[in-house]
């Protein structure tokens, strides 16, 4: 019995050491991570969606299987980190990217997030990860969605890169929105608005095979989301100051 216990302890230690310390990101409390992931979806899709949590030693794992074809998770290194020429010198611990894909997106864009998380967990340095992912994206390793579809980012909080094609500035934002797949479509093609928080009109981001047309929720709808998730927002703010929302503007904590 003692031998079995010893083996179990050693196995546990090996698993815990699976992710390089410099790559490991402190995971969110499991219940908070699941709640945040599901907040990306509209209410009628939450109960039957598949939910994933991030295991720093392995990557994303299913926390709750679903039946409706939607997949929700919280990325801590987003696909936007692989845009632009700026160097990804380290893994940030403040990125918070709740997103949910339909089945079309799960076979396309979602693979980018999941492969990146797995490589990060295996100890791939940040700069090397960006190089690998950019090469894969350029080579068409990740296909564009096979059909029209949607990704939801209706969570009341998002912290990620503002304009990743240009620089690595990060911002916390309260901008619940819906993203429609728009492969190889430009903002000019759709007569898009100026891409900025609070825009009333759609615009294109991440132009290319994995581009999206963005539509923000209105002021009234956003306020309702904020009220629904007030306790969750307070809890996130207590975990990390960078995740605290502002009181008078849709963005904060930019750097």
Q: Where in this protein do the model-derived segments appear?
A:
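Positively charged n-region of N-terminal signal peptides that target proteins for export
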Residues: 1-6
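Bacterial N-terminal signal peptides
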Residues: 7-16
């Amino acid at each position: 019995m003692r031998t079995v216990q010893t083996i179990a302890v050693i196995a546990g230690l090996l698993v815990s050491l699976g992710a390089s310390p410099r790559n490991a990101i402190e995971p969110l409390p499991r219940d908070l991570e699941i709640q945040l992931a599901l907040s990306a979806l509209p209410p009628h899709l939450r109960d039957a969606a598949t939910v994933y949590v991030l295991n720093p030693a392995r990557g994303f794992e299913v926390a709750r299987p679903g039946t409706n074809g939607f997949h929700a998770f919280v990325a801590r290194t987003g696909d936007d980190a692989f845009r632009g020429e700026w160097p990804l010198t380290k893994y940030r611990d403040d990125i918070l990217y709740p997103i949910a894909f339909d089945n079309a997106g799960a076979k396309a864009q979602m693979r980018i997030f999941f492969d990146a998380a797995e490589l990060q967990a295996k100890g791939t340095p940040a700069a090397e990860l960006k190089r690998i992912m950019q090469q894969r994206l350029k080579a068409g390793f990740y296909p564009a969605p096979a059909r029209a579809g949607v990704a939801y980012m209706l969570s009341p909080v998002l912290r990620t890169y503002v304009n990743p094609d240009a620089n690595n500035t990060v911002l916390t934002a309260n901008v619940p929105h819906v993203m429609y797949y728009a492969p190889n479509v430009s903002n000019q093609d759709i007569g898009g608005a100026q891409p900025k928080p609070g825009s009333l009109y759609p615009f294109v981001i991440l132009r290319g095979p994995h581009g999206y047309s963005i539509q923000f929720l209105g002021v009234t709808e956003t306020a309702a989301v904020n009220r629904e998730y007030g306790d969750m927002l307070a809890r996130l703010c207590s975990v990390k100051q960078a995740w605290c929302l502002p009181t008078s503007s849709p963005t904060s904590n930019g750097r």
